[in-house]
Amino acid sequence: MRRLKRDPLERAFLRGYQYGVHGKSRELCPFTLPSVRQAWINGWREGRGDNWDGMTGTAGIHRLNELHAVG
């Protein structure tokens, strides 16, 4: 059975979240299409907020599961 492709906006959000939670710059956004770029930046903001709240490493595992960022 073929696996369905994920929504590109969801994938962009999750990639942005990963960048944000690791403290990387917003300027590293790889997307130029406005809707996808906005989804990435929204994910980055969420990740950055979690980074500031101390949800990194093992403390942030439950948050990654909420966002389905872990398979």
From Swiss-Prot:
Keyword annotations from UniProtKB, A to Z: Cytoplasm, Translation regulation
Localization in the cell: Cytoplasm
GO BP, one annotated term: regulation of translation
Gene Ontology cellular component annotations, sorted alphabetically: cytoplasm
Entry superkingdom: Bacteria
Cytoplasm found in the keyword field: yes
Keyword ATP-binding: no
Pfam family, one: RMF
Family that this chain belongs to: Belongs to the ribosome modulation factor family.
Function in brief: During stationary phase, converts 70S ribosomes to an inactive dimeric form (100S ribosomes).
Entry protein name: Ribosome modulation factor
Gene: rmf
